[in-house]
Amino acid sequence: MPHNFRPGDLVFAKMKGYPHWPARIEDVADGAVKPPPNKIPIFFFGTHETAFLAPKDLFAYEKNQERFGKPNKRKGFNEGLWEIQNNPHASYNTPAAASSSDSEDNQPAAASDAEEEEEAVVPRKAETGSDDSDSGSEDQKKPAVKRKAPALKRPPVKKARASSSDRDGEESGSPSEPEPSPSSDSDSGKNSDQDFTPQKESGGRGGKKPAGRGRRKKASSGSDSDSGSQSDQKAARSDSEDEKPRPAASGSESQSGSKSDSDSEPPPPPPPTRKAPQGRKKAEKPPPKPRARKPKPAPERAPSSSSDSDSDSDTDRVSEWKKRDEERRKELEERRKREEAEELRRLREREKEEEEKRKKDKETKVRRGSSSSGSSSSDDEVDDHPLKKSKKPPPPPIPAPSDSDSPPPSELKKKKESQKGRQKKEKEVKEKKERPVKEKKPQRSEEKHKAKPKAEKPKRKPVRPPEKKVEKKKEPSPEEKLQKLHTDIKFALKVDNPDIEKCLQALDELSSVQVTTHILQKNADVIATLKKIRRYKASNAVMEKATAVYNKLKLQFIGKIETGKPKPNEKNQEEQDAQNTDDSKPVNGESEGERKDVSESESNSKPTDQDNPDENKSPNGIRPDPDEPADQLNDSTEADPTADADVKEDSREQDEQMSSES
């Protein structure tokens, strides 16, 4: 890679999409915009365009002449090779027509005057020329968006690169095109219009680039408005074409460079006006300038625009036909789908109606209790209905429009026939299924009538067995007897309606019940009621009977607990003493072993046994039977005033009842 390049060095410059191009390193003019970092301003021979390139894309001319100096078909390349050898100090082409562009209003200038003007305007070219030259270099070497900045004022550049002769036309024709008068156009034609004119069909890029160069010279000569107008007109027509041909590799670089060049050198008053609008290229420049120059450039761009429009129109037509065909196909498919969906809906609705009618017929038959003949006739009637309805579905009116739009009537007929076949098959299957069902229904109805009484019988049965079970349960269990008798006694001695006879019967039964200590422990309330009844003053018979039963139960407990538990009551002390003397004798037919077992079982007594530990302890130190404390409590309650008060209240109530009855 070349090391350090200096202004004036001859090099081969490489841009993306272009061969190594003969070029020269330019010097940055005073006041011009500085190139971006690590970029070098380049002047391309043959096209006379400028760009900013990195040092890696530059190759020394002398060293690489044999390698890159071979002729090429690229437009302007061969001219560049000739120019770098014969005129290495060449600058922007400025034919004599440039003077005429400067003096459009008054005088056509000579070629010598034009050359002098070129020299005077060189800095300006660095500014505006750099715009167009940079953009041109982008167009040919590395076309990019920079060209768009002025490119908005330039026609498409895509096809201009086709031949090297066209670039010559660009160089020579650039000053001539922007000029308002046809004479300037003819002057530009003198240089290289012969090469350029045959390529107008391709919308030659020469037309655009000359517009840019014309602007450069006009900026120097004061004809910026004219060149701007033409470039604006061309840009308006071919903005889309400008964007297509340019690779964006170095466009941003050249664009920034060209903008900086054009904006940096506004010493004369006209360029500052350019500065502001270039910030808004599309907004301000096109409206004022293109109006004056529209009529002349129109014929120049007519062929290219017409060719482009023709090609576009052809493609548009093809795409339109395709779109229409696709739309038609979609519409046909949608219609077919809709028709099929509607037919299916109709079939389903008809099937539902048939099923409902059949159900109604079946219900009516079951109610009337019609015979099998009636059911068969109804089957025939039901069969007639689907036949009548099957005739309706085939002629749906909807498929007609699809026939008009689409050419497949045969397909629709096939579909109809297939649908008819399906309907018939479905109906036959349904009829086969329904016939046995209809025959079975009367049988089922009879079975239901028979099943109903059976269902009622089990409801009655469960009521009876519980009574038997209750009786069976009550007979064996003394606990239940005790509880029942206890409740009977309570109800019999109610204050409102005392039933003494019933109470006596219950007491008799209670005395006959075989009771164990465990049962009495669970039902201590029975003993408490017996205690209270002993003082029932309303009837002496009840008092006597209750005392007898109470004493009997008490004797049973005392007999069991003789050895270990003396009674605290004074009444029973004598009996306990007598029993203590006869420890060895069994009481109530019990042996000593049984007594011990009972005493052990009674050792787990209730907490009530611990109320009077001194009284309950026997001389042997054995705890009393758990049933004894109940007796003791009962005895203690006899002496309590609360028990006496209860008895007195009962007696008073009974006396009041007797008095009221009398």
UniProtKB/Swiss-Prot annotation:
Compositionally biased intervals (Polar residues): 84-101
The family classification in the record reads: Belongs to the HDGF family.
Q: Where is the composition biased (Pro residues)?
A: 265-274, 393-410
Coiled-coil ranges from the UniProt annotation: 320-370
Instruction: Give any Pfam family that matches.
Output: LEDGF
Its localization reads: Nucleus; Cytoplasm
What region holds the PWWP domain?
Answer: 7-64
Query: Which SUPFAM superfamilies does the UniProt entry name for this protein?
Result: HIV integrase-binding domain (SSF140576), Tudor/PWWP/MBT (SSF63748)
Q: Which GO terms describe its molecular function?
A: histone H3K27me3 reader activity; histone H3K9me2/3 reader activity
Q: Where is the composition biased (Basic residues)?
A: 143-161, 206-219, 277-296
The record's Gene Ontology cellular component field reads: cytoplasm; nucleus
Region listing for Disordered, in residue ranges = 84-484, 561-662
Question: Gene3D superfamilies in the record, alphabetically?
Answer: 2.30.30.140, Conserved domain common to transcription factors TFIIS, elongin A, CRSP70
Q: Where is the composition biased (Basic and acidic residues)?
A: 234-246, 314-366, 411-456, 464-484, 562-574, 645-655
**Residue ranges, compositional bias (Low complexity):** 172-186, 220-233, 247-259
Q: Which UniProt keywords apply?
A: Coiled coil, Cytoplasm, DNA damage, DNA recombination, DNA repair, Myogenesis, Nucleus
- Give the main localization category: nucleus
Q: Name one GO biological process term.
A: positive regulation of double-strand break repair via homologous recombination
Signal peptide per UniProt: none
Q: What does this protein do?
A: May act as a regulator of myogenesis. Promotes the repair of DNA double-strand breaks (DSBs) through the homologous recombination pathway by facilitating the recruitment of the DNA endonuclease RBBP8 to the DSBs.
Task: Report which gene this protein is encoded by.
Answer: hdgfl2
List the InterPro entries hit by this protein, alphabetically: HIVI-bd_sf, LEDGF_IBD, PWWP_dom, TFIIS/LEDGF_dom_sf
Q: What is this protein called?
A: Hepatoma-derived growth factor-related protein 2
